[in-house]
Amino acid sequence: MDIRPERMLSRIRQMAEGAVSPQLVLGLGVVLILGLVVSAMLPDRFTGGGKTGGGVTAQSQALSLPAALPGLSPFTPATPLQFSGRVTQVASIGNDVGWGQVHIWIDNGTGALQEISVAPQAYLTQIGCPSFDGARVSGVGFIFDPGRPNAELYVKSIQVGGRTCKLRDDEGLALWMVVQ
């Protein structure tokens, strides 16, 4: 028996030459692919969805479960708060760690100073916000940690020297962090 590959291929060609045409092979391939596509597109209610016995499951059996998101807590929006007073102190906090933020303390007439987190000095300069030293300011901000005593207020917008400086959006997100 001759088992050389070229000899075996020639015998196979001779046997299939009259029985199978290239058009028939191509046609069968197309029909097979179309059948697979149609089968994949059928809804589960016709195909049983992989369940034995088929049929439709009762909707009342479905339970709504909260998604497990470790480390996340439910979000409650902070209420915007009005503030006004005279600036008694200005400081840039966090410059040593790379996120310098201007903080001001205002005397709002209650006898206690209120700490207010404003914005990075570079952003204040970029938007043309005037100096806070000794100025009378007013504006709107958010306290994101109301349970903490003396929690600072984060400025949404502040008016100083007759100019309004917009620093955060309605959700409290910093405008200087927005990608332009």
UniProtKB/Swiss-Prot annotation:
Changes seen on gene knockout: Cells have a weak magnetic response and make magnetosome membranes. Magnetite crystals are amorphous, smaller than wild-type and irregularly spaced. Deletion of genes mamH to mamV (amb0961 to amb0978) gives cells with no magnetosomes and no magnetic response.
Membrane protein topology class: Single-pass membrane protein
Primary localization class, coarse: membrane
Keywords for this protein: Biomineralization, Magnetosome, Membrane, Transmembrane, Transmembrane helix
Spans traversing the lipid bilayer: 22-42
Stretch forming the signal peptide: none
Gene Ontology CC, one term: magnetosome membrane
Membrane-side (Cytoplasmic) residue stretches: 1-21
Further facts: This bacteria makes up to 20 cubo-octahedral magnetosomes of about 45 nm in diameter which contain membrane-bound crystals of magnetite (Fe(3)O(4)).
Known role: May play a role in magnetite crystal growth and size.
Annotated family: Belongs to the magnetosome MamS family.
Protein name: Magnetosome protein MamS
